[in-house]
Amino acid sequence: MCIRDSYIYKGVKAMKPWVKVSTCPVGKYKDTSRYPSRGWNAFHTVYQDVQGWLGEGIQDQIYPMLYFRGNHFYPFALDWQEQSNGRQIIPGLGIYFLDPSEGNWTLDEIERQMHFIRAHGLAGEAHYRVKYLMDNTQGLYEALEEDFYTAPALQPAMPWIDNVAPTPPSGLTVETPENGYWKLSWQPATDNDKRNAPMYVIYGSDTYPVDTSNPENILAQRVQGTEYTYAPIRPWTARKYFAVTAIDRCGNESEAIQQQ
């Protein structure tokens, strides 16, 4: 990474530390001990020293274009994760190959890659191109909705920028008006950092206390202000108990205030 690029990263962080600086490099960095890159890689072919940038700590996220399968995908995805320096690796998946005119991959191939990503602790995946996702090519959209993206997700924290959680909110009250809407209100977190003022995550569950480690319990996130109206589309699915946490722009989440 040249000095100028280092200055760019430091300049961004000086102005807005929570802004993520990321790169979308060629999918294979170098030959690995597990499998060769077969002559086309980021480092030697297009001079992208991305793992060097990760080592310097001047990247927050990497989206390697891993539009491959088999031995051209798995060893290189793992290599990125092993050299991540704690940063977030989000492989780009070549879902356009599901189209018969592009490659006629099967849906199983993409699903195996996503299971691998989760099993090895990578931060997520990107889908290229979105057209093939929205067109539900080979049932991809349905598979993601039913099997992979079944619950909301909070943004991953960036502890190398800020690892201090905001103070929790307090005084959570829950009103149940006659129209079936739940009105939640609370006292704000007491943090004074106006540039990194926390927002709130609302959780709901049928059991008490509400388990805020379970994403299935997330009802809303990035809530501003100190009130929230819970209006379930299907009243018979309404949650019974509620909790609220504060979360800052770097993804640090406070302890929860539980409904009393």
What are these regions (language model features)?
Residues 19-39, 76-112:
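Active-site clefts of carbohydrate-active enzymes
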Residues 219-225:
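Short beta-strand segments within Ig-like beta-sandwich modules, predominantly Fibronectin type-III
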Residues 230-253:
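Beta-strand-rich modules
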Residues 14, 20-63, 68-79:
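Substrate-binding cleft/loops of secretory-pathway carbohydrate-active enzymes
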Residues 139-140, 144-195, 250-260:
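Pro/Thr/Ser/Gly-rich low-complexity, intrinsically disordered linker/stalk tracts
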Residues 50-73, 87-160:
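Substrate-binding cleft of secreted/luminal carbohydrate-active enzymes
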Residues 189-215, 239:
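Solvent-exposed loop/turn segments flanking beta-strands in beta-repeat/beta-sandwich domains
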Residues 1-3:
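Short, small-residue-biased leader/transition segments that mark boundaries at the very start
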